[in-house]
Regions:
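Intrinsic disorder/low-complexity segments
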Residues: 9, 14-15, 215, 299
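Short, Lys/Arg-enriched N-terminal segments with co-localized hydrophobic residues
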Residues: 10-28
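Membrane-embedded helix-loop-helix hairpins and adjacent transmembrane boundary segments
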Residues: 26-490
Length: 490
C-alpha cells in the first residue's frame, strides 16, 4: 500500500514523471540546472518579444518596416524553415522509414537556391505584405482573396496546429502533465510575444532561437551518434529496409514538404521585410546550406534512434525522448531549449503570416478597402489570435492534425502554384478568368483526390491538382476576353 502511495506521489512531481506512452516506469532525468536553462530561455523569449514591440504602423508590425539586416534575415529564415515540426517530423520519419528523407533534403536545397537566385530579390523589389498579393496585382482582387484564404488555412495548419503538438509533447515529457495541457501552455507563451511585437519581435526572437537551435541540434547529434556506435553501429543494427530508398514514399514527401516552399507565404513575408533586395537574396542563399545540414543531422538522429530506442515509440516523441534519455545534465537543458526554440520560431512566424493574409488579402481587399493603418494593425492582431486559437483547437480536437495540414497545403499548392509562378515569371498574357478557374479547379481536384485517397501512378493528390490547374490556366487564358499583358510591379 505504501509503495502505491509513493508511486502516486512520484507521478505528481516534475522529476518523478513517468512516460506512459512507453508503459514503463522510467524516470525523466531533468535536473535543476536543466530546468533553470529551460525556464530562463522561455522567459527570455517573451522578454525579447516585448522589448522589440513595434506596432506603430502596418508596415512596422507586419514586415518590420522593411529594415531587417543580413544576419537577422538569415537567422529568421533558418529558424522558421527548420521548425519544431520539421525537426521532430524528420527525426521521427527517419526512425520509422530510414533514408526516405534524403531526396527531400536534396530537392529542398535546389528549391532554396532557386528562391534565392530568382525569387527573393524580385519580390523585395516589388514589395508588399503577402504572397497572394502577387495574385491580386496580376489577376485581380478575387484571386487575391481566394489565394489569401487558402494561404491563411495553410499557415494555420503548418504553424499553430502542428507546432502546438510538438511543444505539447515537450512540456508533457518535462512536466508529466497531460499533453493537451502542455499544448495550451505552450501556445499561450507564443501568443503573448507574437501579439505584442509583430515582425520585429518575431525576427529578433528567431535570431536568438536559431543560436540555441543550431548549437543544441549539433550537440544532440554528436552525442546520440556516438551513443549508437557511430555509422558502423547504425548500419549494423538498423533493419535493412531503413537503408533502402522507398521511391514512392520519397516522392510523396517531396510533394508534401518541398513544393509548398515555392509559394510559402511565410517565406515571402521575409523577403518583404529585408532592408533591400540584395539582403533578401543573399540571406536566402546563405540559409539554404545550413538548413539542409540541420535536416541531415535530424536524419542521423532518426537512424540512431532505431538503435537506441524501442521499436514501438510514437514517431512524434522520438526526438524529445532522445534528448531526455541520452544527454547529460546541462546539455540536456540546452538541447530541450533548442527544440522549443525550433517549435516557437515556426509557430510565431506562421501565425503572423496567416494573420496578415486575413488583414491584407481578405479584410482590406474584399471587406474594407478604405481601412486605415490603425485598423489594419488591429485586424492583424485579431487574426493572430484567430489563427493561433483555431490551430490549437484543431490540434486538441482532431485525432489526426496532419490530415488538416495535408489538406490545407494540398488545396493551396494545387490551386495557387501555377497562376502565382506564372504571374511572377511569365511574360505572356494573363487572364483573371483563367487564373480563378484554375485556382478553383486545381484546388478542388487536389482536395477530392486527397480525401478519397485516389492514387494514379503512385503520385500524391497535390500533383493532380497542379496538373489540372495548369491545364485550365493555359487552356483558358489564350481565349479569354480579359487576357492581357500585366506588369506585376504595378
Amino acid at each position: 500500500m505504501s509503495s502505491d502511495i509513493l508511486n502516486a506521489v512520484k507521478r505528481s512531481t516534475v522529476f518523478g514523471c513517468y512516460r506512459n506512452y512507453w508503459q514503463r516506469k522510467e524516470k525523466c532525468m531533468a535536473s535543476v540546472l536543466d530546468w533553470a536553462l529551460i525556464i530562463i530561455y522561455m522567459l527570455s523569449m517573451v522578454g525579447v518579444g516585448m522589448y522589440f514591440k513595434t506596432d506603430d504602423s502596418m508596415q512596422d508590425f507586419a514586415v518590420a518596416d522593411k529594415k531587417l539586416g543580413l544576419s537577422v534575415m538569415t537567422a529568421t529564415m533558418l529558424a522558421t524553415a527548420v521548425g519544431g515540426g520539421a525537426l521532430t517530423g524528420s527525426v521521427g520519419n527517419s526512425y520509422m522509414n530510414g533514408i526516405v528523407e534524403v531526396p527531400k533534403i536534396i530537392i529542398l536545397l535546389c528549391i532554396n537556391l532557386f528562391m534565392g537566385l530568382f525569387v527573393a530579390k524580385k519580390m523585395r523589389n516589388i514589395g508588399g505584405f503577402t504572397a497572394p498579393e502577387m495574385l491580386g496585382r496580376v489577376y485581380g482582387k478575387k484571386c487575391q482573396t481566394l489565394g489569401g484564404l487558402f494561404c491563411a488555412i495553410y499557415m494555420m495548419g503548418t504553424g499553430p496546429a502542428m507546432q502546438s503538438i510538438a511543444l505539447g509533447t515537450c512540456i508533457h515529457l518535462l512536466l508529466g502533465v497531460n499533453m493537451k495541457v502542455g499544448m495550451i501552455i505552450g501556445m499561450a507563451i507564443i501568443l503573448a510575444y507574437t501579439l505584442s511585437s509583430g515582425m520585429w519581435g518575431v525576427a529578433m526572437t528567431d535570431y536568438v532561437q536559431f543560436i540555441f537551435l543550431a548549437g543544441g541540434v549539433l550537440l544532440a547529434t554528436a552525442m546520440v551518434y556516438s551513443g549508437a556506435g557511430g555509422w558502423s553501429g547504425i548500419t549494423s543494427s538498423v533493419p535493412a529496409e531503413h537503408l533502402q530508398l522507398d521511391t514512392s514514399g520519397a516522392i510523396k514527401l517531396i510533394c508534401a514538404t518541398s513544393l509548398p516552399v515555392l509559394i510559402d507565404g511565410n517565406r515571402y513575408s521575409r523577403f518583404f521585410s529585408a532592408k533591400d533586395a540584395k539582403t533578401a537574396q543573399i540571406s536566402t542563399l546563405i540559409a539554404a546550406v545550413p538548413q539542409c545540414l540541420l535536416l541531415v543531422m535530424s536524419l542521423v538522429m532518426g537512424l540512431a534512434a532505431v538503435v537506441l530506442l524501442p521499436a514501438d515509440l510514437p514517431k512524434d516523441m522520438v526526438f524529445a525522448t532522445l534528448l531526455m534519455q541520452y544527454l547529460p545534465t546541462g546539455i540536456k537543458g540546452l538541447c530541450i531549449a533548442a527544440l522549443m526554440a525550433a517549435i516557437m520560431s515556426t509557430a510565431d512566424s506562421y501565425m503572423l503570416s496567416g494573420a496578415t493574409n486575413i488583414s491584407v488579402d481578405i479584410y482590406k481587399t474584399y471587406i474594407n478597402p478604405k481601412a486605415t493603418d490603425k485598423q489594419m494593425v488591429i485586424v492583424t492582431k485579431v487574426g493572430i489570435l484567430a489563427v493561433g486559437l483555431l490551430g490549437l483547437g484543431f490540434a486538441l480536437l482532431l485525432p489526426d492534425v496532419m490530415s488538416v495540414w495535408t489538406l490545407s497545403s494540398t488545396a493551396y499548392v494545387g490551386g495557387c502554384l501555377v497562376p502565382m509562378l506564372y504571374g511572377i515569371f511569365g511574360s505572356g498574357k494573363k487572364s483573371y478568368t483563367g487564373a480563378l478557374i484554375s485556382m478553383i479547379g486545381g484546388g478542388a481536384v487536389a482536395l477530392i483526390c486527397d480525401l478519397n485517397k485516389i492514387v494514379i501512378f503512385g503520385l500524391p493528390a497535390i500533383v493532380y491538382g497542379i496538373i489540372v490547374s495548369a491545364v485550365l490556366f493555359f487552356g483558358i487564358t489564350p481565349f479569354a476576353k480579359d487576357a492581357k499583358i500585366v506588369d506585376i510591379r504595378k
